[in-house]
Regions:
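Soluble catalytic regions of membrane-associated enzymes that act on cell-envelope
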Residues: 426-440
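Basic, amphipathic N-terminal segments
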Residues: 2-304
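Minor-groove-contacting beta-hairpin "wing" of winged helix-turn-helix DNA-binding domains
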Residues: 453-460
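Short alpha-helical segments that sit at the start of domains
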Residues: 365-408
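A short, conserved structural fragment
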Residues: 438-452
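Short acidic, hydrophobic short linear motifs in intrinsically disordered regions
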Residues: 407-425
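Short, amphipathic alpha-helical interaction segments positioned at domain boundaries
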Residues: 460-484
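Transmembrane alpha-helical hairpins and terminal membrane-anchor modules
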Residues: 299-372
Length: 484
């Protein structure tokens, strides 16, 4: 679409983007002997049942704590407990500690200031400035948590709300974008005038770019740079090459998306009537440039100060031109008409453009509520708990399979081989968390280290004997006995 190529560089995700059933069956089919294949499938089930049992108590504590802070029914349950304010605050912090641990285990990351700046440095479908009404958000709960649990690169708004993100995708939209293209042409002309008048530094709305984003002026690939990072192209109208074909024809724009976003916050309240509800909202496939649609307690959008400045300057220039034309000895009616038409046309364009953007905003908000919001509260927490189990099981199975097939390995070699297996068999890339997987294997008792620190596993049959029959297996056998 244009000569400029804008690429966003992001850290590669740790989540394994392969469904567990597909992963297990693919690995099982790589095993030559049918008896070993059967033992491997049995081991996979026992690993999952055991890991699920490990997390059961922690998940139960999490859900019980959330029931006290559920925005819908939590207040009634808290009232029944007859707890003091200090006791409630302790329970709040315990809930957040459990929640943030689950987030980390599910490979969700807190969006940093840098990521937010990169995400919002462009425009996609949402072309209105969206801000949060901070007066409607609590500033105590999260601030207290992060004071006790400091983390690097936290965003400025973390005392009011936290945005977790996981997974990167691509969203494409094809349309004529007539109004947006007109806006783009006007913006370029306005930028040109500012450069002529040496005022671009005062009026420029472009945010400062950080090294995380690489804008390339050619299509040359750089395959040897940052192989471990994920590079995603952003195609925007702002970078479009001006031509009759581009202006009048359909255009495809492209924006990276956050595959999953979870927002945590609490609404503001008074001391006399405190609101203890904690909101946990879950969204999917949110374009980075439109990330504002997931913000809590949004203000109603309006014209920006820059829009008003542009509007007033244009009106003043037009009026000066009209007055100057009238005061001339031979006032030209058509000149006056042309100037007035231009000013009125620009004012009308500004108004209708704003109305169109407002309608788009309302449509996106509705879409985020019905199409892009997966769940909230208890449903989100249950989803997270299952995510943790699925991820841990996949990590353990892949690590054991590599040790079983390729023999002893150092931690670094095991990490590399696991990532290569995922890439070769499934065509996916991820930053494999080998440390966590090895810890689980050692805890299960089916992997050990030799005298020089290399990891090795026991045989499949022995691994099943060490783990032993799980409760789920005993229940299934009992059912089969009752239903011969």
């Amino acid at each position: 679409m244009g000569k400029n190529k804008e690429v966003i560089r992001l850290e590669r995700e740790s989540v394994i983007p392969v469904l567990k059933p597909r992963l297990i069956m693919t690995l099982a089919n790589l095993i030559e002997h049918s008896s070993d294949r059967a033992e491997f499938l049995k081991l996979c089930k026992r690993v999952e049942y055991t890991i699920r049992a490990w997390y059961l108590l922690q998940f139960e504590d999490l859900m019980q704590l959330y029931s006290l802070f559920d925005p819908v029914h939590g207040a009634q349950k808290l009232e029944q407990q007859h707890l003091s304010s200090d006791e409630i605050q302790v329970l709040e912090q315990n809930f957040l500690s459990y929640l943030f641990q689950i987030m980390e285990k599910s490979n969700f990351k807190i969006t940093s200031d840098e990521e937010v700046e990169i995400a919002l440095s462009g425009q996609y479908l949402l072309n209105l400035p969206i801000t949060v009404d901070n007066s409607k958000l609590d500033k105590v709960l999260l601030k207290k948590y992060f004071t006790a649990h400091p983390q690097p690169n936290l965003p400025d708004f973390v005392d009011k709300y936290v945005i977790f993100r996981r997974g990167i995708g691509i969203d494409r939209t094809t349309d004529f974008f007539f109004m947006e293209k007109v806006d783009m042409v006007i913006a370029r002309f306005w930028a040109y005038l500012l450069r002529l008048m040496k005022l671009e530094k005062i009026f420029s709305r472009q945010p400062k770019r950080r090294p995380m984003e690489d804008s390339k002026k050619n299509d040359e690939a750089t395959p040897d740079v940052d192989q471990d990072d994920l590079h995603v192209e952003r195609i925007r109208l702002e970078n479009m090459e001006l031509s009759v074909r581009n202006m009048l024809g359909k255009t495809t724009i492209q924006e990276p998306t956050f595959d999953r976003i979870i927002v945590v916050y609490r609404r503001a309240s008074t001391k006399s009537n405190p609101d203890r509800g904690i909101y946990v909202k879950h969204f999917k496939n949110i374009p980075m440039a439109d990330m504002e649609i997931v913000l809590p307690e949004k203000k109603s959008p309006g014209l920006t100060p820059m829009d008003w400045v542009t509007f007033l300057v244009s009106a003043i220039v037009g009026l000066v031109a009209v007055v100057g034309s009238i005061e001339m000895p031979k006032a030209d009616f058509w000149v006056i008409f042309a100037v007035l038409s231009t000013v009125i046309g620009y004012c009308a364009k500004t108004y209708f453009s704003f109305q169109q953007n407002l309608a788009t905003y309302q449509n996106l908000i509705t879409q985020s509520m019905y199409d892009k919001q997966l769940d909230s509260g208890r449903g989100t927490l249950l989803h997270l708990c299952d995510d943790v189990i699925q991820q841990e099981v996949k990590e353990v199975i892949i690590s054991f399979f590599i040790l079983m097939e390729q023999g002893k390995s150092t931690l670094a070699d095991l990490d590399l081989r696991c990532e290569e297996l995922i890439k070769e068999e499934f065509g996916e890339r991820c930053n494999f968390e080998v440390d966590d997987a090895v810890q689980k294997l050692e805890k299960l008792g089916i992997v050990s280290r030799d005298t020089i620190g290399r990891y090795f596993c026991v045989g499949l049959k022995r691994a099943n004997e060490i783990i032993g029959a799980t409760t789920e297996e005993l229940v299934l056998k009992a059912r089969q006995g009752l239903n011969p």
